[in-house]
Amino acid sequence: MPPHPAFTEKQGQYLAFIWAYTQINARPPAERDMQRFFDVTPPSVHQMVLTLQRQGLIRRQPATARSIELLIPPEALPVLRSIQTVKTSEARY
């Protein structure tokens, strides 16, 4: 198996999300889908997409929505973790 570019834990989660979303929905995610899942701002998602593209982990067509394509095999991806913000509230009496 040829070596794959290294990626950080956070980058791996984005890559795993792109793969899982594409498998479930038969189309790549929009940046808005990633924003909702990871609960981050639009600029954060956009910068991550640009970074993944610069590192040769994804390819996309400029000015074409939902055009993200993974350039690494699924076996090289980490398991996608569920991102949940746990909020607790206290009842005040």
Model-predicted regions and their roles:
Residues 56:
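Glycine-centered, phosphate/nucleic-acid-interacting loop/turn motifs that mediate DNA/RNA or nucleotide
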Residues 13-20:
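Pre-recognition alpha-helix immediately N-terminal to the DNA-recognition helix
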